[in-house]
Each structure stands twice: as structure tokens, then as C-alpha cells.
Design a protein with these regions (language model features):
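Sec-dependent signal peptide cleavage junction
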Residues: 24-39
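Leucine-rich solenoid repeat scaffolds
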Residues: 357-391
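Extracellular beta-strand/beta-solenoid scaffold signature
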Residues: 67-71, 90-92, 111-124, 143-153, ...
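Acidic Gly/Asp/Thr-rich repetitive segments characteristic of extracellular carbohydrate-active
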Residues: 53-83, 89
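Bacterial N-terminal signal peptides
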Residues: 14-26
Length: 391
């Protein structure tokens, strides 16, 4: 009996030891918390944590509380993924840090103001990086939309916005990119709200440079941020964009010091998009030295009396000092359906410099002013205009 009890004790000791070792192994090999651990902030549970970097957001019950809780989750620069699994309200902008992914699915995020913004601290493309937004219906609480910017991203690189629907007033911007390098916008819908003023020229997708007048919000942060830095390597694919203007790469209309070669945008690609303008051009690429527009439907509904604003697809150098003419800088307009007023497709330089190489081919272009104005390519060192159908 004594031997038997001794053996039992030995077995219990071995079992206990193995249990401790196994527990330690699991503790070290996985995480220091159980799956779906609760993440708390200000004494409230705000998320279930599925791994060190994945959070399933739990609504707090108030718009301000949701915004504070989400900003707590997204504001660091560590890699993290936040899943929004409910329709929620926020009172103002979310401010993500670097290396942030927000998965919103088909859920609606309604804000008392805008929805996404970053505040750069230096005039560098690397100041803010690695933001991905997947899905979501992003809107303002007003039925007429925000008369401002819903998503403003500046001095940033490696930005991706996919399958998002963004509502904004005609006089605002659904997405505004200021001095960005390396942005992909894919599968998104930018939808205007409210009434479109007859002379409105605001675009739902704005590709901008950083100057005091084009980016007053940045200027208020620091005048040093507004040095004329342009945007480059911007890709817009499989999107539907409608607005007073649809998509525009902007230039500083009243700031001649920022209309120089170093302030020109470059490498803008727009493919497989449906773009509509109601009171200005559907698609306007100003002061852009290299661009590709392919497989798009571009429609301007602007009255002819609006003159240049009634052009369907415009690519233009505005007055100032443009880049040296080089055939390395290409503008390619291919396989699009373009409907305009004064012109369908219009490529023109208002400076002493010409475009480098311009290719306009396999398009179907229409101008309400007459067939001869369907396609006009002026001021190009080398141009190929071929296999187009005009009306």
C-alpha cells in the first residue's frame, strides 16, 4: 500500500510538472492573454483583441466615446488592424498613426464632421505612411453632406483606400491628397450630396500640392508645411466619382511662386473609372507632367457657356514656369469614352514649354460644340493621335 501511494504521488508530480511546462509553452508561444481578450480604455471595454495587433472594435454608446476609443486604438505607429463590425457614429475625425489598417466592411461610419485626417509634422513624403482603409460607408450626419473634406491625407506615402463609399457635399472633397507619394484608391465610390452651385469647381477627389492657398489647413498647422510640394505616383482604379468636378490634380491659381517645374505633379494613373462633372470638367489634370488615363468613361454635363469648364477630359500646363520639354514625360489617353462640351479631350500648355510625348488613341470622344472639337492636342513635342472615333 505504501509503495502504491508512493507511485501515485510520483505520477501526480509528473502530471503537475507537465501541466506547468505546457502552460508555460502556450504562454510563450502564443500570447500573454486569451483569444478575444478584452481591451479597455477609460474603464470601458472598447475591443476584443484577437492577437497582439488585431482589434474588433466595440461601440461605446456615444459618438465622442467611439471617436476617443478608436483613436486610442489607431494612434500609435505600431502595426495594427482595427475591425469595425457595426454601424457607428463619431463626433469628428479619426487620426490614425503609421502602419494602420481599418477594415469597415459594409458598415456605415457617420461623423459630425469629417472622418479621416492626419496632422503632418514635417514636409516629407515619409512623415506619415502605411495606412490602409478597406470598405466602409463614410458620411456626415447632415443629409446635404460636409462642406469640407471627409478624408484628408497629407505628406504621406504607401496609402491604400479600397472599396470605400464616401459621401460629401458638392462644395467639399470626399478624398483630398496633399503632397502624397504612392497612393492607391481602388474600387471606391465618391458621391456628392446637396445642391450643386452653378459655378462650383470643387472636385470630389482632389490631388493637391501643399501651398498656403491650396492647403489652408496645413498652413494653420505650420507655414513650413506649405512649400509647394506636389503629389506623385497616384493610382485611381475601378472607381465611380461624381461631383461638380469629378477628379482634379490641382494648381495654385493665385500663387505664381508655386507654379514652377518643381511644383508639378507626376505619374498619375486613372484606369477603369466612371467620372462625371456637373458644373466643371469631369477630369482635369493641371500642372501634371506625366499621366495615364485608360478604359474610363468621362462625362461632363457642364453647360457650354461655362467655356473651359465644360471640357470632358483636360490636361493643361497653367501659366508659370513648366518643366523642360522631355519625351520621357508621357501623357497617355487610351481607350476611353469621353463626352464634353467645348472639347471632349483637350491637351494644352499655357506656358512656353510643350508637353513631352502625348499619345491619344482608341478613344471615343464627343463634343457638344462639334466633331472637330472632340479631340484637341496642342503644344506637344511628339504626339500620336490615332484610331479614335469622334462625334
Amino acid at each position: 500500500m505504501e509503495k502504491f501511494m508512493k507511485k501515485i504521488k510520483q505520477l501526480l508530480f509528473i502530471t503537475f510538472t507537465l501541466t506547468i511546462i505546457t502552460g508555460l509553452f502556450c504562454f510563450c508561444g502564443n500570447t500573454s492573454y486569451a483569444k478575444n481578450a478584452k481591451k479597455a480604455y477609460q474603464h470601458k471595454v472598447i475591443a476584443y483583441q484577437d492577437s497582439p495587433a488585431i482589434y474588433d472594435f466595440i461601440p461605446t454608446g456615444s459618438a465622442a466615446g467611439n471617436r476617443r476609443a478608436l483613436n486610442h486604438l489607431i494612434s500609435s505607429d505600431k502595426p495594427k488592424i482595427i475591425n469595425i463590425n457595426n454601424d457607428i457614429s463619431i463626433d469628428t475625425y479619426l487620426r490614425p498613426g503609421n502602419n494602420t489598417t481599418i477594415n469597415a466592411g459594409n458598415h456605415t461610419i457617420t461623423s459630425g464632421s469629417g472622418v479621416i485626417i492626419n496632422a503632418p509634422t514635417a514636409a516629407s513624403y515619409d512623415n506619415f505612411k502605411n495606412l490602409t482603409i478597406n470598405g466602409g460607408v463614410w458620411k456626415n450626419s447632415s443629409s446635404s453632406g460636409l462642406k469640407g473634406t471627409m478624408m484628408r491625407i497629407s505628406y504621406a506615402s504607401d496609402i491604400s483606400i479600397n472599396d470605400a463609399t464616401v459621401y460629401c457635399n458638392y462644395t467639399g472633397h470626399g478624398i483630398e491628397l496633399i503632397a502624397c507619394n504612392g497612393v492607391s484608391i481602388n474600387g471606391c465610390k465618391l458621391i456628392p450630396q446637396g445642391k450643386c452651385p452653378k459655378k462650383c469647381v470643387e472636385e470630389q477627389l482632389q490631388i493637391d500640392l501643399a501651398t498656403p492657398k491650396t492647403a489652408p489647413g496645413l498652413y494653420r498647422l505650420s507655414p513650413k508645411l506649405c512649400n509647394g510640394t506636389p503629389s506623385k505616383n497616384i493610382s485611381v482604379t475601378n472607381c465611380t466619382v461624381s461631383g461638380a468636378r469629378g477628379i482634379c490634380a490641382s494648381f495654385p491659381g493665385s500663387e505664381s511662386k508655386y507654379r514652377k517645374a518643381g511644383n508639378y505633379h507626376s505619374n498619375i494613373t486613372i484606369e477603369n473609372c466612371n467620372i462625371t462633372g456637373k458644373s466643371a470638367e469631369a477630369l482635369a489634370l493641371f500642372n501634371t507632367k506625366s499621366a495615364t488615363v485608360k478604359n474610363c468613361r468621362v462625362t461632363t454635363k457642364t453647360p457650354l457657356k461655362r467655356n473651359s469648364y465644360s471640357v470632358g477630359l483636360a490636361v493643361a500646363y497653367q501659366k508659370g514656369s513648366s518643366p523642360k520639354t522631355s519625351i520621357k514625360n508621357k501623357v497617355v489617353i487610351e481607350n476611353n469614352i469621353v463626352k464634353g462640351g467645348r472639347q471632349g479631350i483637350f491637351i494644352f500648355s499655357h506656358t512656353s514649354k510643350k508637353f513631352g510625348k502625348v499619345i491619344v488613341k482608341k478613344n471615343r470622344a464627343y463634343a457638344r460644340s462639334g466633331k472637330r472639337n472632340a479631340i484637341r492636342v496642342i503644344s506637344a513635342k511628339k504626339k500620336q493621335v490615332s484610331k479614335n472615333k469622334t462625334k
